[in-house]
From Swiss-Prot:
PANTHER family in alphabetical order: NADH-UBIQUINONE OXIDOREDUCTASE CHAIN 3
Purpose of the protein: Core subunit of the mitochondrial membrane respiratory chain NADH dehydrogenase (Complex I) that is believed to belong to the minimal assembly required for catalysis. Complex I functions in the transfer of electrons from NADH to the respiratory chain. The immediate electron acceptor for the enzyme is believed to be ubiquinone.
Organism: Squalus acanthias (Spiny dogfish)
Membrane topology label: Multi-pass membrane protein
Family recorded in the similarity comment: Belongs to the complex I subunit 3 family.
Pfam families named among the record's database cross-references: Oxidored_q4 (PF00507)
Protein name: NADH-ubiquinone oxidoreductase chain 3
Gene name of the record: MT-ND3
Residue spans crossing the bilayer: 8-28, 56-76, 87-107
Amino acid sequence: MNLIMSSVAATALISLILAFVAFWLPSLNPDNEKLSPYECGFDPLGSARLPFSLRFFLVAILFLLFDLEIALLLPLPWGNQLLTPSISLLWATSIIILLTLGLIYEWLQGGLEWAE
């Protein structure tokens, strides 16, 4: 118990020291570049009403769908330990077929073309 308390105290102390140093060091040498906000490549001082690329939005949504596919298919190897492993294989196959049909549809509609 004593070892746990001392390691928690040491961790808290090191975290506080690092947080203090992280806030203290940038204030030693401020300049315009360090004090300006950074917004992922966008100019934060410009107009907020810039048009958003619909193509980029579509590619981002497709990425999220295929990322979700990986999350759904990740436990598939453990599905073989069920009483009826064919059910997990059926669900995985149906997910893959559905996403493949959606990808083919987007491809035929030209949604994957970045520039026309």
